[in-house]
């Protein structure tokens, strides 16, 4: 089955294992993504207002991404097309449609505050 991904022609890179291990940084990004991110057909992405570009820069740095942040219609966009990264986010409870995200993922207690911080940013 074709998924739109080609491992041979990767133009950009990212830490594919970012969502594999609970850390404060990973949990913050997960929380932020629950609130303001989305899983699209072939990418994990965030579209934010101009004033929030700094958050996208932090996420990009945290996940070691070389993907560009693009400006479009008065907002900044970061889209990561990497099936392994997306599958890791899904395993942590991130669902493709925001409107069906009605449960928090099972987060270890010591990281819960980082999830909330990301969610509220």
Language-model region placement:
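Intein-associated homing endonuclease modules of the LAGLIDADG/DOD-type, together
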Residues: 2-121
């Amino acid at each position: 089955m074709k998924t739109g991904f080609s491992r041979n022609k990767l133009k950009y890179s990212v830490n594919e294992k970012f969502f594999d291990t609970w850390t404060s940084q990973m949990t913050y990004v997960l929380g932020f993504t629950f609130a303001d991110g989305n899983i699209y057909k072939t990418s994990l992405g965030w579209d934010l207002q101009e004033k929030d570009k700094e958050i996208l820069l932090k996420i990009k740095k945290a996940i070691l991404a070389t993907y560009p942040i693009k400006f479009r219609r008065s907002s900044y966009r970061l889209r990561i097309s990497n099936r392994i990264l997306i599958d890791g986010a899904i395993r942590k409870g991130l669902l493709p449609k925001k409107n069906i995200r009605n449960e928090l993922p099972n987060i270890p207690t010591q990281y819960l505050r980082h999830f909330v911080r990301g969610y509220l940013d």
